[in-house]
Amino acid sequence: MQEYNFTPESIPILHKYNAKELLKGKEEISLDLGISKEKVESTKEAFFIRGIKVEKRIVEKIAKEKQNNIFFVFPEGVKKALFFDKAVYKLRLVASDTAPTLEINGIHMHRIKGITPLEDAKSKIKAINIKPGDKVLDICTGLGYSAIHAWKASESEVITVEKDKNVLELAELNPWSRELERKEIKIYLADAEEFIKELKDESFTAIIHDPPREALARELYSRTFYSELYRVLAKEGRLLHYVGEPKKRAMNFLLATAKRLEEVGFKTEILKHIKCVLAKKV
């Protein structure tokens, strides 16, 4: 198993909200989605963002955006935080001062209705009750919010696995994912189904399983995979399994997931408010 070398890049970000601030003459704005503020120089025709010239007409166009798009300011030009590689990957703005969500083919990878991605991650950490000293396994890293908050709560090493390199490369451009570079967070670029077979028995006290919807990753909802989760979890360890809300059959899907977990030995509790199943190894 080879650890992924997570290398964050500090790229200035524009979106419709801070673009409007620039056009109104505000000199200090946030270029990292609310983490900090910095000064932007300007002339009648352009803005100078960390020394990069951005023509006023481009900022005006961004300010008129109807969608919640994010734009990176590279020396070679302003580019939307979106790329194609068999699928469409996109960072989507949730608010001007908080972490964005990840979209793959238009599907949100976080709950964003009435909640921010950070609040979503924190609610999962609270639900599984991660404490100092817990050894945490985070399955499906995504933008890393769960792994980051698991590390903060456990004050210990966190192991996280992500199958899609495109997702990790997008995370490297996301200012709210920067703490993934901490040495205590070990990232592995691997298929979770195969990766988990390499892990030792009872080596974790808490597991966060946050897979894509079942139609996209059926193997991560299988009894075979759940058996592996049971094997690597210590006795009395906790598993939090996010299952989302597959259209109108959310409760039935939660019940079916809980049943499969029970069939491999877990004791379960349905947490409908966060669309998760909480399981315990007994």
Where are the model-predicted features located?
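Class I S-adenosyl-L-methionine
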Residues: E245-V282
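Conserved SAM-binding loop of SAM-dependent methyltransferases across substrates and taxa
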Residues: L143-E155
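N-terminal auxiliary segments of SAM/dcSAM-dependent transferases
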Residues: M1-A95
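Conserved beta-strand signature within the Rossmann-like core of class I S-adenosyl-L-methionine
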Residues: E236-V243
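S-adenosyl-L-methionine
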Residues: V161-D201
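Conserved SAM/SAH-binding loop
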Residues: P117, G142-L143
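Conserved class I S-adenosyl-L-methionine
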Residues: K131-G142
